[in-house]
């Protein structure tokens, strides 16, 4: 039997709670066990995982870079909810242009998506796990 497909939903901020770090550790375990992590959907305060402007202290784990590395190595989509991101100042280049802003700060490897993307994942993945 082949492995299962997973999507993770991360609601916790990049450094404000243990939620996002736990999700990252779970993502690693899913992949190590031979399953496929299709996407990670960052929602509510979880969208802060996708900021390019987070600079942790030298002795702290850089969770944004960790997500980027995992996505690149294992072809995982990193999606921030566009509405939640805009409310929290996480802006993609496209959204900046659309709203007449001169700056953007969505980290490389992350994309902004709507709730339809999460709904599709719920219908098509074997497992959706929320953190």
UniProtKB/Swiss-Prot annotation:
Instruction: Please name the source species.
Output: Vibrio parahaemolyticus serotype O3:K6 (strain RIMD 2210633)
Please give the function described in this protein's UniProt entry.
Answer: Could be part of a sulfur-relay system.
This entry's Gene Ontology molecular function terms read: sulfur carrier activity; sulfurtransferase activity
Q: Which GO terms of the cellular component aspect does the record hold? A: sulfurtransferase complex
Protein's cellular compartments: Cytoplasm
- For whether the record's keyword set contains Transferase, the answer is yes
What is this enzyme's class at the first EC digit?
A: transferase
Against Gene3D superfamilies, the record matches this protein to: DsrEFH-like
Q: Which residues form the active site?
A: 81
Enzyme Commission numbers on file: 2.8.1.-
Matching InterPro entries: DsrEFH-like (IPR027396), Sulphur_relay_DsrE/F-like (IPR003787), Sulphur_relay_TusD/DsrE (IPR017463)
Q: What is this protein called?
A: Sulfurtransferase TusD homolog
Q: Name one GO biological process term.
A: tRNA wobble position uridine thiolation
Classification from the root reads: Bacteria, Pseudomonadati, Pseudomonadota, Gammaproteobacteria, Vibrionales
Q: Which NCBIfam families match?
A: PRK00207.1, sulf_tusD_dsrE
Q: Which UniProt keywords apply?
A: Cytoplasm, Transferase
From the UniProt record, report the name of the gene that encodes this protein: tusD
Which Pfam family, any one, appears in the UniProt record? DsrE
Q: Does the keyword Membrane apply?
A: no
Q: Which family does it belong to?
A: Belongs to the DsrE/TusD family.
């Amino acid at each position: 039997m082949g492995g299962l497909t997973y999507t993770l939903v991360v609601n916790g901020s990049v450094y404000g709670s243990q939620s996002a770090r736990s999700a990252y550790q779970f993502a690693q375990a899913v992949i190590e066990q031979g399953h496929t992590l299709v996407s990670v959907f960052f929602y509510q305060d979880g969208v802060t995982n996708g900021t390019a402007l987070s600079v942790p202290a030298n002795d702290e784990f850089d969770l944004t870079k960790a997500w980027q590395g995992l996505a690149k190595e294992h072809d995982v989509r990193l999606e921030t909810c566009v509405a939640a991101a805009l409310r929290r100042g996480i802006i993609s280049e496209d959204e900046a242009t659309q709203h007449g802003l001169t700056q953007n700060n969505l980290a490389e490897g992350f994309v902004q998506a709507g709730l339809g993307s999460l709904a599709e994942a719920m219908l098509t993945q074997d497992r959706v796990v929320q953190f």
